[in-house]
Amino acid sequence: VIVGGVPGDIETALWRSGDVILGSMLALLFCSIYPQRAYTHWRLQMHDSLQQAGRLYHTHLSPNILERPRLAQSHARLLTKIVSLRPLLAPAVKETRLNSTLFEAVQTTMRNTFCTLEMLANTYWRDRQSHFLMQSHPGLRACQQATEAVIIQLALMLKSGDSSAAEAIARLQAAAAEVQAEVRPGADDEATISGYLWLNLQLTEQIAHLHRLLGLVMNPPRSQGNKSS
């Protein structure tokens, strides 16, 4: 490739050698300036997944929709995407030197959260009577809005490191506790929403746990950072 087909053409060979060396140096330079970071890519993909989950949750619970939206395939694609991110965990662990079980816990908690969101949608649209009952309950509506706000804040946390999700989670926990105090499982008019309330409480715990895990991934303890250095 360097010498070419013409014998004795030293000048052309030198020019081609210089081109190869210059191209190699430029490639190394750009690789050092724009590295392929699995950790950053993983965070951005998880951010996109949370945003998509928030949109699905909002669509399912929108008071402007009279019939259940057909989003089963969207939920399935969302769960598939979370599983497809697993190959990024090993290189992300090498880049951050964090414990691999931490990344595994984030993935598992995220998947469980998405499954709970899907179960909430199924319960919300199970039958027309209970649907309108849950839709007209002010406490549940406040809990739903607080859940949407937390999902948005967690997505922002993954993208930019914003730490304001703690306030949104506190509001969600307060809203869930208020609804739990209002609903009496033995009452006939509230029995239909007791299962939905239980799922909301489970979701609140999962979201709070996910927030703690993301805090460790985004801002690891100093002792762990010193060990990695």
Regions found by a protein language model. Name each.
Residues 109-229:
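Soluble C-terminal extramembrane regulatory/interaction domains of multi-pass membrane proteins
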